[in-house]
């Protein structure tokens, strides 16, 4: 069994999702870390501590994080990058290997279309997990990152077995 923590970073809301892989994906936990303050360094601390608590509680083996895409607003891109850095530091501080995926790569792995919108990602995550009701958008995005990583791991594993033959 492999347990993966997926992260959808944000400076105000950071989504997280944890999946176990036992031959099929199993939802362990999903939610959002809401920083709820205007003080930016405090937001980063809350992201770091929130991810740390999640790692300590659920003990994932690997972490997958969505990469920053270029914003039209440079300040927003910088803040997003710093929030992402806080999440990555929390994972690394707990000894997790961290894997990064572009948003387009995540959407392509889940929906089959790199330009899919958040609602399409949310729908596919719920469908794949057999969820009746929708998850929060940030949480479903984080689960999408975890799905993408599991898919990537499976592909590499299959290729490795083929090469050894």
From Swiss-Prot:
UniProt binding sites for Mg(2+) 1: 8, 138
Entry GO CC: cytoplasm; Holliday junction resolvase complex
Pfam (any one): RuvC
Bound cofactor: record note: Binds 2 Mg(2+) ion per subunit.
Cofactor: Mg(2+)
Classification via SUPFAM superfamilies: Ribonuclease H-like
Subcellular compartments: Cytoplasm
EC nos: 3.1.21.10
GO annotation, biological process: DNA recombination; DNA repair
Complex formation: Homodimer which binds Holliday junction (HJ) DNA. The HJ becomes 2-fold symmetrical on binding to RuvC with unstacked arms; it has a different conformation from HJ DNA in complex with RuvA. In the full resolvosome a probable DNA-RuvA(4)-RuvB(12)-RuvC(2) complex forms which resolves the HJ.
HAMAP family according to UniProt: RuvC (MF_00034)
Name of the molecule in the record: Crossover junction endodeoxyribonuclease RuvC
Gene source species: Methylococcus capsulatus (strain ATCC 33009 / NCIMB 11132 / Bath)
Taxonomic classification: Bacteria, Pseudomonadati, Pseudomonadota, Gammaproteobacteria, Methylococcales
